[in-house]
Amino acid sequence: MQSLGAVMLTSSSQRNTSSSRTTSDSELLHAKKDEDFDQIFPEALGRLSACHWSPVHVCRTAAQLLVVQPGTRVLDIGCGPGKFCVIGATTTQGHFTGVEQRGKLARTAQEVVKKHHVPRVEIVHGNIQDVNFRDFEAFYLFNPFEENIMPALRIDYDVELEPRLYTEYSAHVQQQLLRMPMATRVVTYCGDGLEIPDCYACVKTAFTDKLKLWVKKHPSPAYTHAAALSADDHRISGGGEDYAFA
């Protein structure tokens, strides 16, 4: 399984946290470098970005893959301080909703959206099990449940982390995706793809296969949680058509 730590773009020691924050809001929101964009967050959260928040170039690519027409409704599962949602809304015409169970991160995301007047973004403080997937057309996942099985990556002690929750949340997402209509789009960044049902095909990849676009191509079988979770080997190793793109 690809770890969050394995995709760290820069170490916190490389991040210039002592530089003067004189860049305009507009420049920050459209920044193409993480060290620039992350200045919209409190410094403590900015230092977590390299490991825990999606890189800017990944956010841009993922948003473009998910938004197929103006107004496409995208759900970011485990949105953290809202980095993907903000970048998605400023680079596409989609509507982005982020769900985050940590209250502090959700509030930070809400404050960023309000302060910078970011359009078409909603941040929800809550658990993924309380979200109605049918309110959305596309989904983004950057290893949202991995902390439960890799305690070294723990952000804080504000929420319960248990290995059983990794399986439980992954199974829940998989079951919700099974119920979605044909042509539903999902982008995953890193992770083992446990949340993706077999009726979805991987149709594009990027960044040495770390980022994958999945599209629902087949009708949903009548899976139970256990059956669905046991049928992922060929899919994770590249089942479906894979096309690398720039």
Which sequence ranges carry the predicted segments?
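C-terminal substrate-binding/active-site "lid" region of AdoMet-derived donor-dependent transferases
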Residues: 148-223
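Conserved SAM-binding motif I beta-strand of class I
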Residues: 95-100
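Conserved short alpha-helix immediately C-terminal to the canonical SAM/SAH-binding motif I
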Residues: 104-105
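Conserved class I S-adenosyl-L-methionine
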Residues: 71-80
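Conserved SAM-binding loop of SAM-dependent methyltransferases across substrates and taxa
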Residues: 83-93
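Short SAM/SAH-binding signature in class I
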Residues: 136-150
